[in-house]
Each structure stands twice: as structure tokens, then as C-alpha cells.
A protein has these predicted regions:
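Adenosine-nucleotide cofactor-binding segment
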Residues: 1-44
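Short, glycine/polar-rich helix-capping loops at beta-to-alpha or helix-loop-helix junctions
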Residues: 2, 66-70
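Short strand-turn motif at the edge of the Rossmann-like AdoMet-binding core
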Residues: 36, 59-62, 85-87
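Helix-to-beta-strand junctions that scaffold the AdoMet/dcAdoMet cofactor pocket
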Residues: 49-51
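Short glycine-rich, flexible loops that bind phosphorylated cofactors or substrates
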Residues: 40-41, 63-65, 89
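C-terminal capping/lid region of NAD(P)-dependent oxidoreductase domains
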Residues: 29-31, 56, 63, 67, ...
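C-terminal substrate-binding/catalytic core of Rossmann-like NAD(P)-dependent dehydrogenases/reductases
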Residues: 18, 22, 26, 69-123, ...
Length: 157
């Protein structure tokens, strides 16, 4: 994270994680992206938020066997939860806070051009398309599945 431009990096499993985040951010973060799709991850993210903060729910939280204290973690501090499924976005017309797929691609390219993001460091595995079923099963079942897994579509498949 630090190599890709993050100002700080903390282990969410460490004691007092939320307290550390609130301390360095001087009262909590304004924006967070929850990527795990795990209820405990959402709860921990909410614990790190500043008043009127926004949380993008990028992780696919399809398991409903967790609880959130919505009053103290969402309603009282005025937190906005934003569903980040790409099908919910405008296709062509972006507006403040509502960006298109093309807007996201341009933002990623700007981050790369300014050395704030190095995609080569993100890619951990490359597979042939013929391996897609095996890779997908790992994605579903392996809690340690790497973030950067890609398919090589150039070869014969």
C-alpha cells in the first residue's frame, strides 16, 4: 500500500486498529472502500469513519449472518453506504460523486502516470482462460485469494 502512494498502512487484525486510523486521520476517514465482503470488515470500516463519511461497498457482502449497529455506526454519525456494483452506475453521463466506467479508467491511468499506482505490483498470478473454472473455485473458496489475478487472453485457448 505504501509503495502505491498510501500515506499510512495498518494491519486490520492488530489491536486498536480503528483507534489508530482515527488518530492519524484526525477524527476518522471521510471515505472508505470496503473490499472484503465480510461483515466484520464492514463493522471495522464503520468504526474508522468520520462524521458524514462515505463507505463504498465494493466487497460483495452476500452473507447476511452479521449485524451492524445501524443507529450508532450509520444513522447517528450520518454515514452514507454506497452500493458499488458496476451495474448501478450511469453508462455515459457522470456527475459529482457518480462516475462512469470510463471515468474510473481515466482515474486509474492518471494514478499510474503520476506513479501513485503501479499495477505490476498488484498482479500476483496470470492464468490461461482454460483455467477459469479452477481459478473461480479458488476465488469462491479461498479466503486468501490474491487481489491481482488476471487471465492472459493473447494465447491460444
Amino acid at each position: 500500500a505504501l509503495k502505491n502512494g498510501a500515506d499510512y498502512a495498518f494491519d486490520p487484525l492488530e489491536k486498536d486498529f480503528a483507534k489508530k486510523v482515527i488518530e492519524v486521520s484526525k477524527g476518522g476517514v471521510n471515505t472508505a472502500v470496503e473490499v472484503t465482503g465480510v461483515g466484520a470488515g464492514l463493522n471495522e470500516t464503520l468504526d474508522c469513519m468520520a462524521k458524514l463519511g462515505r463507505v463504498a461497498l465494493l466487497g460483495c457482502t452476500r452473507i447476511s449472518d452479521f449485524t451492524v449497529d445501524y443507529y450508532s455506526k450509520v444513522h447517528f454519525p450520518g454515514i452514507s453506504l454506497i452500493g458499488a456494483h458496476t451495474h448501478a452506475r450511469a453508462e455515459l453521463e457522470s456527475s459529482h460523486g457518480n462516475y462512469t466506467h470510463i471515468d474510473d479508467i481515466k482515474a486509474i491511468l492518471r494514478l499510474c502516470a503520476n506513479n501513485r499506482l503501479t499495477l505490476c505490483d498488484v498482479v500476483k498470478e496470470t492464468h490461461q482462460p482454460s483455467e477459469c473454472e479452477e481459478v473461480y473455485q479458488r476465488l469462491i473458496n479461498d479466503k486468501n485469494f490474491p487481489v491481482g489475478v488476471q487471465f492472459d487472453w493473447k494465447g491460444e485457448w
